[in-house]
Amino acid sequence: MLQPKRTKFRKVMKGRNRGLAQRGSKVSFGTIGLQATGRGRITARQIEAARRAMTRHIKRGGKIWIRVFPDKPITNKPLEVRMGKGKGSVEYWVAQIQPGKMLYEMEGVSEDVAREAFRLAAAKLPVSTRVVTRTVM
């Protein structure tokens, strides 16, 4: 699963997920991409599950780029523990997703195969998505 090798701080505050994706919103590496249209948090497990679904569908053809990385730790206190006594321990890692963020990119397969692979991947993700192609200027 994806997670940072080391971080400056072990735990972070919750924060707010507002605004639109300023960076990473265009197809940069492949020819077709899966772009988020909604906002939310994607866990490392969900990123991996979507990657596996795509990889199984394209069957060794083409290349996949993962454009998101889970760099935010989410903490959780154990069950039946009273409030207080500090922040809980880190349970999993998430990537915060804003509308417009490119999640995955692909090349080397036909467009209909790529669209079907992205459809399978989108079913594993908690944010709404759309398929976009690279615009040639």
Swiss-Prot record:
Organism of provenance:
Alcanivorax borkumensis (strain ATCC 700651 / DSM 11573 / NCIMB 13689 / SK2)
Biological processes, Gene Ontology terms: translation
InterPro entries, A to Z: Ribosomal_uL16, Ribosomal_uL16_bact-type, Ribosomal_uL16_CS, Ribosomal_uL16_dom, Ribosomal_uL16_sf
Name this protein carries in UniProt: Large ribosomal subunit protein uL16
Q: Which CDD domains match?
A: Ribosomal_L16_L10e
Q: Pfam families, alphabetically? A: Ribosomal_L16
* Role summary: Binds 23S rRNA and is also seen to make contacts with the A and possibly P site tRNAs.
A GO-annotated cellular component: cytosolic large ribosomal subunit
Q: Which GO terms describe its molecular function?
A: rRNA binding; structural constituent of ribosome; tRNA binding
Question: This protein's superkingdom?
Answer: Bacteria
Assembly behavior: Part of the 50S ribosomal subunit.
